[in-house]
Amino acid sequence: MIKKIFSWFESRIDPYPEAAPKTPEKGLWRFIWSNIEGVRKWIAVLAVFTVGVGIMEALMFQFMGKVVDWLGAYTPQTLFVEKGHALIGMMAMVAFFAVWTFFASCVRLQTLQGVFPMRLRWNFHRLMLGQSLGFYQDEFAGRVSAKVMQTALALRDVVMTVADMVVYVLVYFITSGVILSSFDVWLILPFICWMIGFAMIMRFLIPKLGKTAARQADARSLMTGRITDAYSNIATVKLFSHGAREAAYAKQSMEEFMVTVHAQMRLATLLHTCSFIVNSSLTVGTTALGIWLWYHGQVGVGAVATATAMALRVNGLSQYIMWESARLFENIGTVNDGMATLSKPHTILDKPQALPLKVTRGEIKFEHVDFSYEAGKPLLNGFNLNIKPGEKVGLIGRSGAGKSTIVNLLLRFYEPQSGTISIDGQTVDSVTQESLRAQIGLVTQDTSLLHRSVRDNIIYGRPDATEAEMISAAERAEAAGFIPNLSDAKGRRGYDAHVGERGVKLSGGQRQRIAIARVMLKDAPILLLDEATSALDSEVEAAIQESLDKMMEGKTVIAIAHRLSTIAAMDRLIVLDKGRIIEEGSHTELLAKQGLYAKLWAHQSGGFLSEHVEWENN
C-alpha cells in the first residue's frame, strides 16, 4: 500500500517532458517562474500542506497549555470524567496531524525533491545542446555542465524554501500570535522584540551571505572548468610536461574559491553568535514575563507553559530559519550565476515555418555572402560560389583563408551577416537545422569521438543501421582490422570497447578511420572532407582512398586539404586567399595557367602546401 502511494506521488511530474524547452526569461523571479512551468500546481499543493502543518503545530502548544490547566483544576478521578472527550479529540487531532504530515512529506520528497531538479536538468541540457558553436568557444564545457547541475538544485531549493519554510514560518507565527493574545496581549511582546532583532540580523548578514554565495558559485564553476580542461587535454599536458603548471593553474582558481569559503564561514560565525543572543533573550524574556503575569493573576499556569514552550520552539526554529534563509540567499546567488549562462538566447534558430531540407540534386550556391567572426574584421566579403550537382570541389588556401568557414556556414554553424547560402534552391536558414545536417556528411582533421563504445560511435551516423551495415562501414573505412583487438578497463572488447573521452584511447589514425566509417554509414548526399585523411599514414590512406572514391560517387563533395595530391583529382579546384577566390579550374587547367596553384604544386614538400609561397592579391 505504502509503495503504491509513493509511486503515485513520484509519477505526478514528468522528469523528461517532450516539449522543446523555451529559453528562460532574464531576471531572477521571471527566470524561476518560467522554469517551474509544469510543476506550479504541486508547489501550490505543498504550500497548502505547509499552511496546515504550521497551524496544527501552533495548536498543539495551546492544547498542551490547556492540559496543564486541567491538571491543576481537576483530580485524577474527575479529569477523565470532565475532559475525557477533549482528550480523545486531542488524540484524534494528533493522529490526523501525523497523516497530514505524511502526505505533506510525500509531496515534498516524492513529487518535488528528486523529480523537479531532474526535469530542470533535462530542460537545461536540451537548451545547451541548442547553443551555437560560437557559444562553446567562449565557455568551458565543464563550467557549462557545472551550471546545469548546480542551477537545477539551487532553483529547486529556492522554490521549495519559499513554498515550505517561508510559508510555514509565517503561518506558525501568525497562529501563535493569535493564541498568545487570547491569553494576554502582553505575551506577544517578547516575540515582537525577537522578530525585530532577528530581522536586523537577517537584514545585515543574510544579503552578505547571498553575495558571497554568488561569488563562490562563480569561483566553483571556474575551478571546475579549469580542472576539467586539464583532464580533457591530458595528452597535451603530458606532451609538454606541464603537470605542475596545470596544478598551479588549478590552484589559483582553488585559492580564489577558498577566499569565498573563508568569507562565508566568518559570516556564518557572526550569524550563529547573534542568533544565540537573540534566542536566549526570547526564552528568558518570555518566561520572566509569563511568571510576572501569573504572579499578578492575569494568566494561568497553562498560558505560561504555552508561551514558554512556544519560545523554546522558536528558539529551535530560529536556527532552521537562519540557515534556511542563508541557504535561500546562497541558492539565489547560484541561480543568478547560472541564469547568466542558461538564459542566453540561441543565436541560430529555426524559423517558425522552417521545412525539412529535400536534396534532389545536391547543387550548392553561395551568393554575395559577407561574414566575419569579429565585427570590423570581414573574412568573406561578397563571396560567390556555385557548385553543380554531383561536382567534386577542392578548396585550397593557407590557414585563415576561409576554407573551414565556408564549410561551417554551409552547415549553418554560423550565420552570415548578409547574402544567401542554398542547397537545391532552399536557403539553409529556411530549413530545419536537423534536416540540413542530416543531409551532409562531415569528416574533419580534429576528430572527436564520444566516450562510448566503438559501435555507438560508428552507428551515430545512422542510428537505425543494422549490425551488418555498421560492420561493413568499418571494413570500408579500413577500421575492421584493429577494432577486434581493442579493449577497455572494464574488459569490454572489439566493437563494445569504450574509446575514452574524445577517443583518447585510440591513435589519431584509428579515430579518423572510425569517423570515416561513421560518415560512410550515414551516406548523406553531400559530403564535406576537411583534411579527412590527414591523420592516416600513406599505406592506410591509399587503402582507404578507393573506398572514399566509391563513397563520393553521385554526391556533391567539398574537400579541404593542405596535401594537394589528395584533392588533385577533384572536378574543380578553388584557390582562396583572404576570403576571395583567386584561381579555379581542374588540376590540369591550373597547372597550364602557370599561376599560384602551379607555384604551390611546384613548391610542395612531401605533398604538403608550403606556407612560404608568395600569395598574390589578384
Language-model segments: what does each one mean?
Residues 37-38, 133-134, 150-159, 163, ...:
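An intracellular "coupling" helix at the cytosolic face of ABC transporter transmembrane type-1 domains
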Residues 128, 250, 366-368:
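Conserved catalytic Walker-motif region of ABC-type ATPase nucleotide-binding domains
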Residues 25, 29, 44-45, 121, ...:
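Alpha-helical membrane-protein architecture signal
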Residues 1-57, 72-90, 104-113, 126, ...:
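Membrane-integrated ABC transporters
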Residues 15-25, 56-72, 93-141, 145, ...:
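Juxtamembrane helix-loop junctions of ABC transporter transmembrane domains
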